[in-house]
Design a protein with these regions (language model features):
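Catalytic Walker B motif of ABC-type/P-loop ATPase nucleotide-binding domains
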Residues: 120-123
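Conserved catalytic motifs of ABC-family nucleotide-binding domains
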Residues: 116
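Conserved ABC transporter NBD signature motif
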Residues: 24-32, 39-40
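ABC transporter nucleotide-binding domain
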Residues: 138-227
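Short, small-residue-biased leader/transition segments that mark boundaries at the very start
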Residues: 2-7
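Conserved ABC ATPase signature
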Residues: 95-99
């Protein structure tokens, strides 16, 4: 929602030192924002949602400038390593105005890494990008995780959160309404859907009140919803066989993060 976007942006701006908080406490990597603001900012690398890079510098020059702003000495800079990590080493001396949109997004990630922060904030890194670029950015994010970097990812794309995150928080109307591991979050919905491809319509007299809800019953498809903790699918298969039904195929559908999100925000 728009309200959640505003609060999310304010939260990131507070961490970045752009906005002063009015109340509360912020602890980042053991540092209190009020007492140690510099240490907090050095502990973070923030990748903004908007693509905003100087078109007249090369990636290599931009990273060196960024490192200088954080006080990284020349002998301690890892510019080439970072460019290699985000697959931009072959473009290190090209003007940024000549880079594609995907390359510019990767360059923003590279800028956030110059001072070796333990935490990276990626603000909707794949917003508005095509499928191929999204997959490439996902691989970059996974590479950072393997290096031990803690990543805070903001996204409206729920599949992205489910695919990449170990823990997920959901903001609704400015409030954090859920925060848990991805596995626990997905387990918040206990129902599961089962779809049978069959050869004829099922007689429902024998099929009702068996611990599941019938969603579809046609000449070719029978679909049910059931509680995965309480119901054994062998029971339904046995009932179908008793009616002389030929099961051509079975497809199982687990709830995804979108189902969890809708359930939480509606309640």
């Amino acid at each position: 929602s728009a309200a959640s976007d505003v609060y999310k942006r304010q939260f990131i701006n507070i961490l970045a030192g752009v906005t002063d908080k009015t109340s509360g406490e912020v602890i980042v990597w053991g540092f209190d924002l009020d007492k140690n603001p510099r240490q907090v900012r050095v502990s973070l690398g923030i990748v903004p949602q908007e693509i905003n890079v100087d078109p007249f510098f090369t990636p290599k020059k931009l990273l060196d400038l960024q490192a200088g702003l954080f006080g990284v000495k020349k002998k301690d800079r890892i510019t080439d390593t970072i460019l290699d990590l985000v697959a931009l080493k072959d473009k290190s001396n090209s003007y940024t105005r000549n880079l594609s949109g995907g390359m510019k997004r990767r360059l923003l990630i590279a800028k956030a890494l110059v001072h070796k922060p333990p935490i990276i904030i990626l603000d909707e890194p794949t917003a508005g990008v095509d499928v191929e670029l999204r997959k490439n950015l996902w691989e970059n994010i996974r590479s950072l995780r393997k290096l031990g970097v803690t990543i805070i990812l903001t996204t409206h794309y729920l599949q992205e959160a489910e695919e990449l995150c170990d823990r997920i928080g959901i903001i609704h109307k400015g409030n954090l309404i859920a925060l848990d591991t991805t596995e626990n979050m997905l387990n918040k919905i206990q129902t599961k859907t089962l779809k049978f491809e069959i050869n004829k319509r099922i007689v429902l007299d024998d099929m009702e009140n068996k611990g599941y809800n019938i969603l579809t019953n046609t000449d070719s498809e029978f679909k049910i919803e059931y509680n995965k903790q309480e119901f054994n699918i062998q029971k339904i298969i046995k009932l179908l066989e008793n009616q002389g039904i030929v099961i051509k195929d079975i497809k199982s559908e687990d709830p995804d993060l979108e189902d969890v999100f809708v359930n939480l925000t509606n309640n």
